[in-house]
């Protein structure tokens, strides 16, 4: 268990379960206001041979039992499972099942990164979406299917071209910027940057100004939705999503 900020009486409390390999904690914290207590815990490590096996194993509800109950025991009013592919790998029904399991473990408001991304894209008025991601096949196609089944027209699906899933952990912000600019599409209402391993906080305002449309990232959407679930707002100057309220908000 990792307590990320100091508890003060009366503060809203939220919790995050991150996949064991999550490395962007410091960046994620930039979206949280100082008067919200947020606590992060991690899943157990899982063995895997490829991208699909990794996210499939991390997408099992049983993996969330211990960390979710720990967060609930510490007073979390809402909990998010912070992992994109882990929460879309089994489709819309699988994402819903994860939230239902989290609720069964005692969470009052349960969210996932993939579910938050859908809410975020709808909030900015997107119907046609360009997607940038670090995945290998067939995980990329599962992402496209998840978005389509959620009501979006995926007009472009652009990979970062990484050789392995581990390479996502060392992607630099400029690589993300270059990939989003290259992966945008004239017909897209918004761009979605999938994967919580990618750095996006400082890139989002630059990209939105350059492209003239909303750019939503996985970590941004998760923080936005989780904070909205307890009636709070995420911080981030020049990020269009943050002008809107989540539909799951309190």
Name each model feature, range by range.
Residues 17, 77-82, 130-131, 188-195:
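Periplasmic-binding protein-like
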Residues 217-250:
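C-terminal functional extensions of proteins
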Residues 99-103, 108-163, 243-248:
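Conserved beta-alpha
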Residues 61-74, 175-188:
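Short, well-structured alpha-helical segments in soluble
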Residues 1-66, 132, 137-172:
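N-terminal glycine-rich anion-binding loop in soluble enzyme alpha/beta folds
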Residues 178-207, 223:
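Hydrophobic alpha-helical
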């Amino acid at each position: 268990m990792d307590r990320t900020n100091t508890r003060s009486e009366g503060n809203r409390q939220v919790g995050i379960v991150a996949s064991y390999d999550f490395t962007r904690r410091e960046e994620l914290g930039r979206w949280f206001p100082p008067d919200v207590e947020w606590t992060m815990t991690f899943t157990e490590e899982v063995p895997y041979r490829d991208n699909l096996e990794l996210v499939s194993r991390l997408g099992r509800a049983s993996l969330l039992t211990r960390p979710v109950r720990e967060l609930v025991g510490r007073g979390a009013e809402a909990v998010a499972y912070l992992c994109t592919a882990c929460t879309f790998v089994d489709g819309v029904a699988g994402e819903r099942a994860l939230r239902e399991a989290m609720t069964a473990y005692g969470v009052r408001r349960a969210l996932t990164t993939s579910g938050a991304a859908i809410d975020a894209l709808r909030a900015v008025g997107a119907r046609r979406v360009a997607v940038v991601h670090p995945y290998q096949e067939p995980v990329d196609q599962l992402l496209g299917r998840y978005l389509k089944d959620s009501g979006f027209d995926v007009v472009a699906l652009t990979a970062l071209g990484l050789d392995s899933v581990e390479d996502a952990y060392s992607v630099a912000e400029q690589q993300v910027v270059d990939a989003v600019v290259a992966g945008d599409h004239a017909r897209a209402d918004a761009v979605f940057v999938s994967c919580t391993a990618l750095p996006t906080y400082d890139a989002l305002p630059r990209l939105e100004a350059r492209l003239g449309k909303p750019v939503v990232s996985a970590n941004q959407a998760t923080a936005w939705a989780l904070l909205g679930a307890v009636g709070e707002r995420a911080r981030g100057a020049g990020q269009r999503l943050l002008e809107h309220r989540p539909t799951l908000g309190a």
